[in-house]
């Protein structure tokens, strides 16, 4: 049975690319406050595997969930959507 799982894909901003073959990606989402109804921005930092060291700080990237690659890395870089202004 070769069934592919539906893997999550999210977009975010690269906040660090100092590690070898690893990016830190900030993913923001908007949630509604339960009592007041105001939309609040919440964020999550994820470590993503970058095989070719393509991502640079400030880039807008797409990452996809994958099997655990290390203690903290369970995401893989799919593509760079927009380069940061240099």
From Swiss-Prot:
<dbReference type="InterPro" id="IPR019979">
    <property type="entry name" value="Ribosomal_uS17_CS"/>
</dbReference>
<keyword id="KW-0687">Ribonucleoprotein</keyword>
<dbReference type="Pfam" id="PF00366">
    <property type="entry name" value="Ribosomal_S17"/>
</dbReference>
<comment type="function">
    <text>One of the primary rRNA binding proteins, it binds specifically to the 5'-end of 16S ribosomal RNA.</text>
</comment>
<dbReference type="InterPro" id="IPR012340">
    <property type="entry name" value="NA-bd_OB-fold"/>
</dbReference>
<dbReference type="InterPro" id="IPR019984">
    <property type="entry name" value="Ribosomal_uS17_bact/chlr"/>
</dbReference>
<keyword id="KW-0689">Ribosomal protein</keyword>
<keyword id="KW-0699">rRNA-binding</keyword>
<dbReference type="GO" id="GO:0006412">
    <property type="term" value="P:translation"/>
</dbReference>
<dbReference type="InterPro" id="IPR000266">
    <property type="entry name" value="Ribosomal_uS17"/>
</dbReference>
<dbReference type="GO" id="GO:0003735">
    <property type="term" value="F:structural constituent of ribosome"/>
</dbReference>
<comment type="similarity">
    <text>Belongs to the universal ribosomal protein uS17 family.</text>
</comment>
<keyword id="KW-0694">RNA-binding</keyword>
<dbReference type="GO" id="GO:0019843">
    <property type="term" value="F:rRNA binding"/>
</dbReference>
<dbReference type="GO" id="GO:0022627">
    <property type="term" value="C:cytosolic small ribosomal subunit"/>
</dbReference>
<comment type="subunit">
    <text>Part of the 30S ribosomal subunit.</text>
</comment>
<protein>
    <recommendedName>
        <fullName>Small ribosomal subunit protein uS17</fullName>
    </recommendedName>
</protein>
């Amino acid at each position: 049975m070769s069934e592919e799982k539906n893997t999550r894909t999210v977009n975010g901003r690269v906040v660090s690319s100092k590690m070898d073959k690893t990016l830190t990606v900030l993913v923001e989402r908007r949630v509604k406050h339960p009592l007041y109804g105001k939309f609040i921005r919440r964020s999550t930092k994820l470590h993503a595997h970058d095989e070719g060291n393509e991502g640079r700080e400030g880039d807008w990237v797409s990452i996809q969930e994958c099997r655990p690659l290390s203690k903290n890395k369970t995401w893989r870089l799919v593509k760079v959507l927009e380069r940061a202004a240099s």
